[in-house]
């Protein structure tokens, strides 16, 4: 079990370095975002308390759905009776799924695009690239604030897209990594000023 988990982490990291995050509607994080977007209209309310309760129910629903799906998948794999087949299937699926919770290459790509634009003294391009990885308005940021924004984003996303998923995977397996991602995606979707809970 421990060897299997180590192999899964190794292959997931290798996949991230080789492939990165393909932009696709079939990415599990995109599915989580769509589920949240589907549930948000039911939570909107003029009462702040009711909207807060609605947001909590959305997060609870998303965590429950993600948890059930991943526990079910792990149970299905455990039913395979041939040990080597079970190991191969578990490592293959586990690596691919765990990779979808990790975003090292994608963050590196976006952060370097900002830094490269700053080094070329193209602050408009740097602001544009930065706007893809931060929530704040970047239109009037100077060079120091642009670099500060990149550093802040890389720091936050190191936790959200690397150490967090791996930590929860180490303790709870794939369900833990995915529930963690579901919580971080929920936070992002539910705290945008135009959506809910702000």
Short names for language-model regions:
Residues 16, 188-194:
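Conserved small/polar residues in nucleotide/adenosyl-binding loops
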Residues 8-23, 90-116:
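Hydrophobic alpha-helical membrane-embedded segments
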Residues 2-4, 65-82, 167-183:
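Juxtamembrane "helix exit" motif at the C-terminal ends of alpha-helical transmembrane segments
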Residues 81-93:
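Hydrophobic alpha-helical transmembrane segments
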Residues 106-174, 185-190:
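Polar-ligand-bearing catalytic/cofactor-coordination segments
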Residues 28-43, 76, 114, 129, ...:
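Hydrophobic alpha-helical segments of integral membrane proteins
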Residues 18-57:
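N-terminal transmembrane-helix/juxtamembrane module of multi-pass inner/ER membrane proteins
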Residues 41-70, 146-156, 164:
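Multi-pass membrane catalytic core of lipid/isoprenoid biosynthesis enzymes
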